């Protein structure tokens, strides 16, 4: 698999872009997660960044990527509404893995947003989408631009939701490369990796949380619920960071 030129690929018609990505994804599917990271660092353009929500399985991708690129910027979009356990988990992992953590936030504070818009997460799908745009999408776009990102690593997995079930290892998003090294992992592989490397799940895992985001849009799992139903009141799965 040869090196990719981002500007040349972006200049291609959509059909030719898709064909080029299909070809390389056919080969990436047969590599291990570690080999995918190594291939990306050798063949995709820098600057490289890694995003993390510091959710349930976050330690896996953080460890996997930083073993090969210790100083890679780790982007966190902090909404100001994360669980106290999440903030402590961020501190613990940042110290343990010596992360180059880069925190980006909305232009206005949570209090200012509530004064101006009310509690957007209580205003149906439209309110949730506006909340996500203000607190996640816009800060992430700003982060990618500020860090000059051309290749973006993320820890999504197909098993997590129906909307992620068809995601490829490598894609173009926001005009940059996006590589998902553990996209085909199942829960067992996540557990094995964490155990092998002395890493922990998010602290709320033991309290019955399968997915962790903001306090007001995250629910503990109950019998009969899918993982998707534990977020955003079951109205949607994605926060917008990994869409488009």
Swiss-Prot record:
Disulfide linkages recorded for this protein, renumbered to the chain, are: none
Question: Which residues catalyse the reaction?
Answer: 239 (nucleophile)
Q: Does the keyword Metal-binding apply?
A: no
Question: Keyword Oxidoreductase: yes or no?
Answer: yes
Question: Which residues belong to the signal peptide in this entry?
Answer: none
The protein's name is Phosphoadenosine 5'-phosphosulfate reductase
Which Enzyme Commission number(s) are listed? 1.8.4.8
Pathway of action: Sulfur metabolism; hydrogen sulfide biosynthesis; sulfite from sulfate: step 3/3
Q: Which domain of life is it from?
A: Bacteria
**Annotated organism of origin:** Yersinia pseudotuberculosis serotype O:1b (strain IP 31758)
Q: Where in the cell is it found?
A: Cytoplasm
One Pfam entry for this protein is: PAPS_reduct
Q: What is its main location?
A: cytoplasm
Question: Which UniProt keywords are given for this protein, alphabetically ordered?
Answer: Cytoplasm, Oxidoreductase
Q: Name the CDD domains for this protein.
A: PAPS_reductase (cd23945)
Query: SUPFAM superfamilies, alphabetically?
Result: Adenine nucleotide alpha hydrolases-like
Query: Any idea what job this protein has?
Result: Catalyzes the formation of sulfite from phosphoadenosine 5'-phosphosulfate (PAPS) using thioredoxin as an electron donor.
Any single GO molecular-function term of the entry would be: phosphoadenylyl-sulfate reductase (thioredoxin) activity
What does the entry list under GO cellular component?
cytoplasm
Catalytic activity, reaction form:
[thioredoxin]-disulfide + sulfite + adenosine 3',5'-bisphosphate + 2 H(+) = [thioredoxin]-dithiol + 3'-phosphoadenylyl sulfate
The similarity comment for this entry is: Belongs to the PAPS reductase family. CysH subfamily.
Might you name a Gene Ontology BP term for this protein?
A: sulfate assimilation, phosphoadenylyl sulfate reduction by phosphoadenylyl-sulfate reductase (thioredoxin)
The gene coding this protein:
cysH
């Amino acid at each position: 698999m040869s090196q990719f030129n981002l500007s040349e690929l972006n200049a291609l018609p959509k059909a030719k872009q898709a064909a080029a990505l299909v070809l390389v994804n056919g080969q990436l599917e047969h590599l291990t997660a570690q080999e995918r990271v190594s291939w990306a660092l050798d063949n995709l353009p820098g600057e490289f960044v890694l995003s993390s929500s510091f959710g349930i399985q976050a330690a896996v991708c953080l460890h996997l990527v930083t073993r090969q690129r210790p100083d890679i910027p780790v982007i966190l979009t902090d909404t100001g509404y994360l669980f106290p356990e999440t903030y402590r988990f961020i501190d613990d992992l940042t110290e343990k893995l010596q992360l180059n953590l880069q925190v980006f936030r909305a232009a206005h504070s949570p209090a200012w947003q509530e004064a101006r818009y009310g509690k957007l997460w209580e205003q149906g799908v439209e309110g949730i989408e506006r909340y996500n745009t203000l607190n996640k999408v816009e800060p992430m776009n700003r982060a990618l631009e500020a860090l000059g990102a051309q290749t973006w690593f993320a820890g999504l997995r197909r098993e997590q939701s129906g909307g992620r079930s068809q995601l490829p290892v490598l894609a173009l998003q926001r005009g940059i490369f996006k590589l998902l090294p553990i996209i085909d992992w199942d829960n067992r592989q996540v557990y094995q990796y964490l155990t092998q490397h002395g890493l922990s799940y998010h602290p709320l895992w033991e309290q019955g949380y399968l997915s962790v985001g903001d306090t007001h849009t995250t629910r503990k799992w109950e019998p009969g619920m899918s993982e998707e139903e534990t977020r955003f009141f079951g109205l949607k799965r994605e926060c917008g960071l990994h869409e488009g």
